[in-house]
Structure formats: structure tokens, C-alpha cells
Amino acid sequence: GVLNDTLSELLGEKIETIGASRTDAGVHAMGNVAVFDTNTRTPGEKISYALNQRLPEDIRIQLSEEVEPDFHPRYCDSEKTYEYRILNRKFPVPTERLYTYFYHYKLDVDKMKAATSYLIGQHDFASFCGAKAQVKTTIRTVTGIDVWRDGDIVTIRVTGTGFLYNMVRIISGTLIEVGNGQYPPERRSEEHTSELQ
């Protein structure tokens, strides 16, 4: 991608980054971590400044530093948080197009909140992953889901130790189905999860 190409050009060697998370089309990442090996003598803390001079305006590096050789961003003890912002009104707002999903049917945030209790915890999320998911296990732990409305914006924030391909997008879609009255909170969520015994 753009980051690998820019790093390779900057450092004069082929660079392949490993990121903590993937980002789908239309997704903005804040606080994503990436690591790469290099033979450069450039101090780690200076790389972010040089990168930001070359990267497109919609990509910014907040910090760069040297890490231990065994550091891997996907496997460090941390949680990931995804946030979906839904513009919930009759007509779209052009200035929100890049940062929200437009949905014109009225959403009942209280019902959406009620449905989250069935999704929090350790579950088999097999029915919450996209067809491309090729993993050893579909068991994941969701540590928190918050849903709130601020004016016309409904926000769904999902936190967990790791997610399957498209899992958060499917969780958000399920909560939207509950919020528009298509399903009661308990039915739609229980259909999709099976509690580990």
C-alpha cells in the first residue's frame, strides 16, 4: 500500500509493514500500530517526521520509535476498538459522507443498547464473519459495546481482544436491524451467538 511504498522510497530498501489491524474501504484508523524491519541508520523517532512530508494528507504518522525485534502489533496484550457512526436522518449531509454511514429509517437506540448484552463476552461469532475469514477458531471476546445518539449521529463502539473479518460491520448491521424494529433485541442477537460453556 501507500505506507509500504513511501517507506521503501524514504529508506531506500523494500519495506513490508505488519499492522495491528486491517482497515476496510471507507474506514478511518486512529491509533493503528505498524512495525517493519529496516537496515537504516535513521533514528526511529525521526522517521515519522520524514514520512509525513511524503504521505498523502489523509494519512498521518503520530509517532515512530524503535522496538524490540520480537514485538508484533497483532499479538501484544491490547484491545481494539472500532467505532461506526451512522447519520440517522431523513436526508444525507454531504459533509458527513466520508465519516458516517447514512441510514434514513429512525433507529431506536434503547433497543440497540439492549441487544448488546447478548454480544458481550466470549462467544462463537461464526455467523458474524465474512466469507473470506480463514481462521482456526471463530471464538472471540467482545469486552464492551456502547451505543449512543448525539443529534442525528448514532455511534456504535465495539471493543474486544480481536475480531474476525467483517465481524464489527456485521455486529453493527445486526444492531441496526434491531434498532429499526426488524427484530427484537434478544432474538436477533441470540440467533447469532452461542455462549461458551
Say what each PLM segment does.
Residues 1-194:
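Structured-RNA-binding interfaces characteristic of tRNA pseudouridine synthases
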